[in-house]
Amino acid sequence: MERLFEHTLNTRPILENSLRFIRSDVPTQVSAAEKDRLAAHNITTIVDLRSAAECAKAPSPLMDDARFTYLCRPVTVGNAVPETADDVSRLYIAMVDGALRRTIDTIWNTKTNVLYFCSAGKDRTGVVSAILLHKSGMSLEYIVADYMKTASNLKAFLESYAREHPGIRLDVIMPHERYMEEFLAWLAAQKI
């Protein structure tokens, strides 16, 4: 399948040969042809995981198109830049509160294909993806491999971000297998 969006870095289906769940960074520039492509592939439920402030700063043009059901489901618990590598998996675990569980249920039970995203499509989107893949019965290796695609997709962006924000450590914000493996070890004991 062709790219869904020209101006995103991390848009992709999480299940092979299926458009059921599409993860992304925020699509802020969406052409009419891209909207038509989404609708043609029945990707009509849009779940925005960003905070109200993030949405106001960078609104998605999918919000105002009647062909799409646009759901604002902010993930705000654990929504901070981790200071150390040890904080990352704890941050991911903290995200899984009642609101996120309801969001997962919404995504899982909707009748259409779903596009979901946060700002960079890395942490909040990564946690949602991991849970959806876990519920789909995918292996730990598959889930970690999906998560690690984000490292290559966002490498240049994250390097630039770390240069522009000297207090942010690149080795912490860059996805590492360990972060997802620790989260998945916790997730295996949950009933989600």
Regions found by a protein language model. Give the residues of each.
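Ser/Thr-glycine-rich phosphate-binding loops at phosphate-binding pockets of nucleotides
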Residues: 120, 124-125
